[in-house]
């Protein structure tokens, strides 16, 4: 009995311990979870109250860059593709036949008019000159003798010792000798001229090209192969074309320049349209339109003192035809294209954005003229446009701050736009902006 009582007592103790453990675990779970839930609920309630009072205060404002619309004097340019040509081009050839004895120029050097370029063997022409001079001396002596005889005949004719026929014959002989002397003088002059032609000089100032004939070759006059070609590049000309629709603007610009005794300025830019090479003026306009292309040719002249323009070089020619006064100008990046047309995002004093439809005018890669829809002094968004909706408040940042955006999504999107994977209509030129008219900003 005692043994059975001990076993029963132990069983009760064991069951009591197990029950106590179970109660402790359940109590901990119940009271601990409840406390956490209460804390979480309090936080959510606080968030709800915060949201109800101030909106999404913990959501950061979208960063954008902005610029202010300004009033400027904007010149209007017409741009056309042109080719640099020498003001004068001379093909140097020999006027006499003979062996090329020497060349007195270096290929590519600048020469002045009158500089000696080449020498032809002068000995044959020296001999011709000597012969002509000898013939002149002979005929001059004959003439002198005939004149003396004529003087005697005239005296004898007065006394009747000779007939009139003999006197006339002697007079004719004198005139014949005078003609021979003149012919001899012409032969001498011709020989001297041929001797002069044996020394070939530069007819104009300019740059010589590559030599076409080597020393020692026999040269004939009138040959198709020149000795060298000289191009005058100080000044130099640019021939370019513009559509026939631009003729009225060009003619008006010429008339305005004539009234003030000024010139119509023309600029030469490189083929990338990023660097201005030279400044010149409009020289002439062709007198007819090319019916094939519907364009007209113009010629501009440049001093080219620094030799930046080279014959046959392709350039972009820009002719200034007008000057817009008090034009409203914004950066090109601010203008967007939508279904309703061109528009910009403007900013009020609270940095809230609003869409404004605008009419664009002259524009280039940096700025665009707003003909209607915007006033000077208004702020417009130039970067971060893809994040905007009507009335949203934004944060205006500097370019440096915008580049250090800590938002991973924004940074990734900006990188994608920089790589060109995300098309951005605002980066390009507005569709209804003039394709060729540019502003002075492209000079910088």
Swiss-Prot record:
Specify where it is mainly localized. membrane
Q: Compositional bias (Low complexity) spans? A: 409-419
Q: Which GO terms describe its molecular function?
A: efflux transmembrane transporter activity
Region of interest (Disordered), residue spans? 37-60, 398-444
Which residues are the signal sequence here?
1-20
Keyword terms, alphabetized: Cell inner membrane, Cell membrane, Membrane, Repeat, Signal, Transport
Mind telling me which SUPFAM superfamilies this protein's record contains?
Answer: HlyD-like secretion proteins
**InterPro entries annotated for this entry?**
CusB_D23, Multidrug-R_MdtA, RND_pump_MFP
Gene Ontology cellular component terms for the protein in this record:
efflux pump complex; plasma membrane
Ranges of Polar residues composition bias in the record:
37-52, 435-444
The domain of life is Bacteria
Assembly and binders: Part of a tripartite efflux system composed of MdtA, MdtB and MdtC.
What family name appears in the similarity comment?
Belongs to the membrane fusion protein (MFP) (TC 8.A.1) family.
Name by which UniProt lists this protein: Multidrug resistance protein MdtA
């Amino acid at each position: 009995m005692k043994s059975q009582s001990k076993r029963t007592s132990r069983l009760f103790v064991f069951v009591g311990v197990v029950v106590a453990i179970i109660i402790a675990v359940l109590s901990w779970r119940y009271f601990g979870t409840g406390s956490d839930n209460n804390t979480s609920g309090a936080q959510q309630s606080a968030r709800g109250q915060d949201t109800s009072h101030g909106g999404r205060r913990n959501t950061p404002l979208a960063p954008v860059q902005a610029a202010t619309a300004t009033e400027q004097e904007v010149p209007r340019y017409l741009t056309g593709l042109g080719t640099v040509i020498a003001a004068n081009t001379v093909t140097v050839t020999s006027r006499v036949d003979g062996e090329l004895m020497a060349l007195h120029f270096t290929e590519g050097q600048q020469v002045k008019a009158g500089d000696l370029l080449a020498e032809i063997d002068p000995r044959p022409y020296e001999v011709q000159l000597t012969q002509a001079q000898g013939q002149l001396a002979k005929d001059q002596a004959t003439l002198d003798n005939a004149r003396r005889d004529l003087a005697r005949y005239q005296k004898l004719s007065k006394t009747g010792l000779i007939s009139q026929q003999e006197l006339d014959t002697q007079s004719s002989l004198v005139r014949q000798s005078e003609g021979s002397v003149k012919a001899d003088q012409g032969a001498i002059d011709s020989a001297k001229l041929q001797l002069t032609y044996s020394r070939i000089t530069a007819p104009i100032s300019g740059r010589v090209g590559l030599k076409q004939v080597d020393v020692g070759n026999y040269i004939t006059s009138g040959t198709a192969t020149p000795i060298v070609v000289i191009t005058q590049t100080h000044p130099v000309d640019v021939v370019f074309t513009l559509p026939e629709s631009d003729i009225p603007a060009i003619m008006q610009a010429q008339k305005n320049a004539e009234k003030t005794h000024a010139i119509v300025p023309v600029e030469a830019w490189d083929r990338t349209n990023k660097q201005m090479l030279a400044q010149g003026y409009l020289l002439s306009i062709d007198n007819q339109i090319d019916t094939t292309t519907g364009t007209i040719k113009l010629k501009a002249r440049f001093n080219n003192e620094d030799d930046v323009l080279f014959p046959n070089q392709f350039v972009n020619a820009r002719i200034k035809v007008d000057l817009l006064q008090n034009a409203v100008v914004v950066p090109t990046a601010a203008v967007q294209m939508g279904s309703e047309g061109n528009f910009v995002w403007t900013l009020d004093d609270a940095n809230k954005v609003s869409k404004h439809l605008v009419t664009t005018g002259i524009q280039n890669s940096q700025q665009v003229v707003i003909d209607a829809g915007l006033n000077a002094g208004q702020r417009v968004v130039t970067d971060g446009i893809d994040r905007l909706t009507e009335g949203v408040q934004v944060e205006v940042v500097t370019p440096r701050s915008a580049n250090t955006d800590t938002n991973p999504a924004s940074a990734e999107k900006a990188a994608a736009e920089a790589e060109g994977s995300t098309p951005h209509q605002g980066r390009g030129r507005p569709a209804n902006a003039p394709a060729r008219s540019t502003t002075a900003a492209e000079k910088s």
